[in-house]
Amino acid sequence: MEELVGLLRIRVKRGINLAQRDTLSSDPFVVITMGSQKLKTRVVENNCNPEWNEELTLALRHPDEPVNLIVYDKDTFTSHDKMGDAKIDIKPFLEVHKMGLQELPDGTEIKRVVPNRENCLAEASSIVSNNGKIVQNMILLLRNVECGEVEIQLEWIDIPGSRGL
């Protein structure tokens, strides 16, 4: 069995202007996958601007493994409708974490990541110091859908005794 590097906590905050998949609205939920790990939020019924505010934690063994986010519309009698997807680019976040800058004053911006073809950012994203931790807030532009964004926050959790990053 491969050794854990650490834990990646993803706070799935909210959806913004998600696509309508049912008659009047949608019943969205988020699925995050990394390798064989698959985590999901609760369903928010009848809402194209849902507030999840849920923490999903992935065990990281391979820092280069892609992290994917997919939004679905829950359907009771048929398969769930896909409402878009995004790749979460964690590389800049992990690079900053390796610098060991957790002791900076709260709110200090360490790095700014701009949208490009390699990430799904809707706007520039800041990696900042927050209560002795490094966090990154992002708004992801969903792909393969007519509209929609998802706001998330990344946070790294060290595991005592692990090899770390």
Swiss-Prot record:
Transmembrane feature ranges: none
Name of the protein described by the UniProt record: Protein C2-DOMAIN ABA-RELATED 7
Binding site for Ca(2+) 2: 22, 27, 73-75
Oligomer status and interactors: Binds to PYR/PYL/RCAR abscisic acid intracellular receptors in an ABA-independent manner, both at the plasma membrane and in the nucleus.
Compartments where located: Cell membrane; Nucleus
PANTHER family (UniProt xref): PROTEIN C2-DOMAIN ABA-RELATED 4, PROTEIN C2-DOMAIN ABA-RELATED 6-RELATED
A GO BP annotation: positive regulation of abscisic acid-activated signaling pathway
Binding site for Ca(2+) 1: 21-22, 73, 75, 81
Organism: Arabidopsis thaliana
Keywords: Abscisic acid signaling pathway, Acetylation, Calcium, Cell membrane, GTPase activation, Lipid-binding, Membrane, Metal-binding, Nucleus
PROSITE patterns to which the protein is assigned, alphabetical: C2
One Gene Ontology molecular-function label: metal ion binding
SMART domains xref list: C2
